[in-house]
Amino acid sequence: VAYDDIVTNLNLERLKAMYNVNVFTPMMMTKNVIRNMILHHTKGVIIHISSISVHTGYKGLAMYASSKGALEAFSKDTAREWGPMGIRSNVVVPGFMATAMSSTLTDDQRNKIYARTSLKAATSIRSVAETVAFLLSEKAESITGQNIHVDNGTI
């Protein structure tokens, strides 16, 4: 969920609502998943989804980026805490994708975003999904505590 505005217009209620979805819900889900893994003596993988806006700085996205940045920090610490039990935690950091959340942007706004990428295009939703699938697989058994960028080379 995105709440976009400039910092001087910050609305605490809207910010809290966004944090409930983007930060607190994934945290609670992670807590319950790990408790279940411990109960059943199983190893596992947790994948969180962030946003390239954490790493680039776009006007009007400070609040949204802060929520995704919080999730990145949480995921890294989760990996450190639970790695010894065989639980891996990573973040996939997608670039701009054509989704319902981005559907209100004008062509000019989209083109400005594409201009900041090496491939000059929207990030493929399929490539993001395939990255998640890879991280969930045994092929990624040595990857934990990482932010994996799938962003068409956003610069």
Please give the residue ranges for each predicted region.
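Active-site loop immediately N-terminal to the catalytic Tyr-X3-Lys motif
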Residues: 8, 56-62, 84, 120, ...
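Catalytic Tyr-X3-Lys loop
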Residues: 8-28, 47, 71, 114
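Residue(s) in the substrate-gating loop at a strand-loop-helix junction
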Residues: 51
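Alpha-helical segment proximal to the catalytic Tyr-Lys
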Residues: 35, 39, 80-84, 141
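Conserved Rossmann-fold SDR core element
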Residues: 72-75, 82-97, 143-150
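Conserved mid-core segment of classical short-chain dehydrogenase/reductases
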Residues: 1-16, 35, 60-63, 101-107
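Active-site helix of classical SDR
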Residues: 30, 67, 75
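C-terminal substrate-recognition "lid" of short-chain dehydrogenase/reductases
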Residues: 27, 121-150
